[in-house]
Amino acid sequence: MPPAMADNLDIWAVDSQIASDGAISVDFLLPTGIYIQLEVPREATISYIKQMLWKQVHNYPMFNLLMDIDSYMFACVNQTAVYEELEDETRRLCDVRPFLPVLKLVTRSCDPAEKLDSKIGVLIGKGLHEFDALKDPEVNEFRRKMRKFSEAKIQSLVGLSWIDWLKHTYPPEHEPSVLENLEDKLYGGKLVVAVHFENSQDVFSFQVSPNLNPIKINELAIQKRLTIRGKEDEASPCDYVLQVSGRVEYVFGDHPLIQFQYIRNCVMNRTLPHFILVECCKIKKMYEQEMIAIEAAINRNSSNLPLPLPPKKTRVISHIWDNNNPFQITLVKGNKLNTEETVKVHVRAGLFHGTELLCKTVVSSEISGKNDHIWNEQLEFDINICDLPRMARLCFAVYAVLDKVKTKKSTKTINPSKYQTIRKAGKVHYPVAWVNTMVFDFKGQLRSGDVILHSWSSFPDELEEMLNPMGTVQTNPYAENATALHITFPENKKQPCYYPPFDKIIEKAAELASGDSANVSSRGGKKFLAVLKEILDRDPLSQLCENEMDLIWTLRQDCRENFPQSLPKLLLSIKWNKLEDVAQLQALLQIWPKLPPREALELLDFNYPDQYVREYAVGCLRQMSDEELSQYLLQLVQVLKYEPFLDCALSRFLLERALDNRRIGQFLFWHLRSEVHTPAVSVQFGVILEAYCRGSVGHMKVLSKQVEALNKLKTLNSLIKLNAVKLSRAKGKEAMHTCLKQSAYREALSDLQSPLNPCVILSELYVEKCKYMDSKMKPLWLVYSSRAFGEDSVGVIFKNGDDLRQDMLTLQMLRLMDLLWKEAGLDLRMLPYGCLATGDRSGLIEVVSTSETIADIQLNSSNVAATAAFNKDALLNWLKEYNSGDDLDRAIEEFTLSCAGYCVASYVLGIGDRHSDNIMVKKTGQLFHIDFGHILGNFKSKFGIKRERVPFILTYDFIHVIQQGKTGNTEKFGRFRQCCEDAYLILRRHGNLFITLFALMLTAGLPELTSVKDIQYLKDSLALGKSEEEALKQFKQKFDEALRESWTTKVNWMAHTVRKDYRS
């Protein structure tokens, strides 16, 4: 591949001949002040380069002043602008990637704490010096607390036994319960497993009860070997641990075998579970090595502990409940408003608690100016300071006011068509910028003094009066070009003013309860309880009217005793601008029953910002198992964005569970790191990542290997894109293979735990099987050899340039649907493959082996592309090609069940763009969908006409397979239809959960999930406002419509197939 000069800054990748081990000119700075320039191989290790330099040093002045070579190491400034000392000299120069090719020879440092900071900065993609430079008291306080928290976690690991360490580092994956429909897939009620001893060719198979504990398998294997080898090989079952063949996964503990996810999957897929008996001494050796690293980390941390804070002076403070003055601020001026001098500008301000407006918004006067707009205007809100809730936020919107006649001429710098406008009194208001800030600081002190707020210019859709209460309370870090608002909070002249502490709130509630009887909630009769139940049964999107909210608040004790799940609606009914109601609610919350975790998730939505409510919600989540927490981790990371302060119950909870379970830790790491580039959350996610790394030093090496591999793949993908136009596909593939064979790439991409699944080892690339795909972003198709029993290879796709977060969300929903169906005793053989965003528009996708797209199956069965889509026998014939007899019957059964699952799922989620290249089938019969670029009913259209007219895909070739190729097989089709109806009703019973999970993702910035209106599709598809009978009738109509209009799908597929055949 020829050199590409598109990005001259990336000297380590782009400006190089990737077909050869190119050299680069590096400047070396010696401690004596001598400067030497050498040509060194890009792929050389730091140790080799040091030896090269030392040979040259002899020829330069003042050599005699230098110490021994081992007394020195190199230092550089890395890609995150951090000064990094290169202590690990086995690393290659092209992997170190200095910002410039300059290496400084320095005396070996003895400060291990600085080295750890440097490693953490490289790993999280953000130098820790950036946090120091902020000089933000909240950031510093949080980092100090989290450092103490993480160090305590490390200390707790030191006392673990090796088996507890194994449980923490390689946690077994369990299923919650035993499924009834597994019985027919066992062999006479027995489970068949294969076991072989490590470093031995002996393989033993057993038929055992699925309810046995793993230790019993150890015992059976040892007994069987004793019968062959005799007593010289006698050993105890406790001397071994079962390891899944070819995976970093261990099966141990007290759970029955059938509850281990690996064994469950083997049974469902009718494959043989295969284990290796590993000696415990090998595990203990791994344990001891990590303990050494942990003890070193403890020493590193303790060597650089921050100095203790000086004792605080006792000072008099006041509480806001003693202040009955109206809340007011001074709007001083605005800078860099980016409007013409003649354009008049307003500022609108509103006080919010969640999405609730606490009082009327206030608007400044209209002024115009060139750059600075000076108001010096006092804005007074219709609420007293004493009634301000703790989580009140002040939201600003800056907008230009233009006459309709002058609009066309005056808006060239505002780009009005991009955002919504408000028309009032013959004028048009165009948004310019928005910004939010908290009324209280992270310590609960009422803000005072001058504040400069650097604003954001990107407006989401459907804002209330252009204010964006759901937006971040962080100001724009790119201050140089951002609109700035200068405001002044009133000074507290006598003493600082705080929100009352918890004990004062409870005292106030007790005082109210014992005093005014009007404040005490009453009890409702049967009639009121029936009305209350009807209100509480509504879905989370339903709006409450004023009378309904009053009724819920009045009957709050009935809610607590009879309808504890009503808590979200009670919280929406309280008047948050009334201190008496807030105090009584906090007291009530202390005795409110714990909600099931799935119901408590709703309380983390933006509508519920109160600190104590969110602490209550997190308390409910503590009941979750690790497997259940993993299921909802995507949403829990997203709702961190709703937290106004760094130190909160949710961030501590996630850190605690991640540090207790390395599998959760890996996914938390990647969910955070994939968005650390986003300005609004860069600091928040960055400091949480730092805390995780400090508390999981043993995991850093694994994560660093993954980061290094992904950086290599990103570089390779960029090179392929740059040269795709110049080279033929064959030449491009050859150049890709040449690159992957280079030692630097081979080492970086080998023997790493898959980011998609830490149990899977990506051992060695099958370079000749690797390729890049034809789509615009040239995804990399990578094939690895597999060490797993009965598995030849493992495939992953690396994408760079596509946002995978919407695919992640859709696949998560498919996984949840699969779980809910199984809980109800219905297994629809869903296949939600792995997908993980790992960076800015980049990530990994799992390749499902032995599968083909419907388009390829149809094309391969026909000589003419135009008729391929209409060949109803193609799919059944393809299944017959790989299956016969009983296997064919099982394949058709797999197809029938999975087709039912995906029909219902694609209808409920509104998955669009369903053509024959994003529906696939495994050779075993499982059907599954891929590529979820359009969801929630956002179907593709052309010239205003929807290309997809059916609610879900159900073509006649699918029905042909379901009916086993027999046209009149109504029994099989009737069973398929019944499966679809049962599956739909099961999902509908959990409709509130789906709405909650999508609502929690509103802040993710997904293109098709930007407002509550987008979630309305779910409410409609699940018919949540109707009875079950009405809902089922609606689904039956949709089913008939899909069947009736399936010819339109075939026409679309024909057009797609013809285009595909033409392109190839």
Curated annotation (Swiss-Prot):
Phosphorylation at Ser-1064 down-regulates lipid kinase activity. Autophosphorylation at Ser-1064 negatively regulates the phosphatidylinositol-4,5-bisphosphate 3-kinase activity. Heterodimer of a catalytic subunit PIK3CB and a p85 regulatory subunit (PIK3R1, PIK3R2 or PIK3R3). Interaction with PIK3R2 is required for nuclear localization and nuclear export. Part of a complex with PIK3R1 and PTEN. Binding to PTEN may antagonize the lipid kinase activity under normal growth conditions. Part of a complex involved in autophagosome formation composed of PIK3C3 and PIK3R4. Interacts with BECN1, ATG14 and RAB5A. Phosphoinositide-3-kinase (PI3K) phosphorylates phosphatidylinositol (PI) derivatives at position 3 of the inositol ring to produce 3-phosphoinositides. Uses ATP and PtdIns(4,5)P2 (phosphatidylinositol 4,5-bisphosphate) to generate phosphatidylinositol 3,4,5-trisphosphate (PIP3). PIP3 plays a key role by recruiting PH domain-containing proteins to the membrane, including AKT1 and PDPK1, activating signaling cascades involved in cell growth, survival, proliferation, motility and morphology. This is Phosphatidylinositol 4,5-bisphosphate 3-kinase catalytic subunit beta isoform. Residues 772-778 are annotated as: G-loop. Keywords: ATP-binding, Autophagy, Cell adhesion, Cytoplasm, Endocytosis, Kinase, Lipid metabolism, Nucleotide-binding, Nucleus, Phosphoprotein, Transferase. It is an enzyme of class 2 (transferase). GO terms for cellular component: cytosol; midbody; nucleolus; nucleoplasm; nucleus; phosphatidylinositol 3-kinase complex, class IA. GO terms for biological process: angiogenesis involved in wound healing; autophagy; embryonic cleavage; endocytosis; endothelial cell proliferation; homophilic cell adhesion via plasma membrane adhesion molecules; intracellular calcium ion homeostasis; natural killer cell mediated cytotoxicity. Its main location: cytoplasm. Residues 188-279 form the PI3K-RBD domain. Its EC number is 2.7.1.153, 2.7.11.1. It is found in: Cytoplasm; Nucleus. Residues 20-109 form the PI3K-ABD domain. One of its GO terms (molecular function) is protein serine kinase activity. Belongs to the PI3/PI4-kinase family. The modification Phosphoserine is found at S318, S1064. Disruption phenotype: Mice have defects in autophagosome formation. Have normal bleeding time but are resistant to thrombosis after arterial injury. Mice fail to induce tumors in a model of prostate tumor formation induced by Pten loss. Pfam families: PI3_PI4_kinase (PF00454), PI3K_C2 (PF00792), PI3K_p85B (PF02192), PI3K_rbd (PF00794), PI3Ka (PF00613). The lineage of its organism: Eukaryota, Metazoa, Chordata, Craniata, Vertebrata.
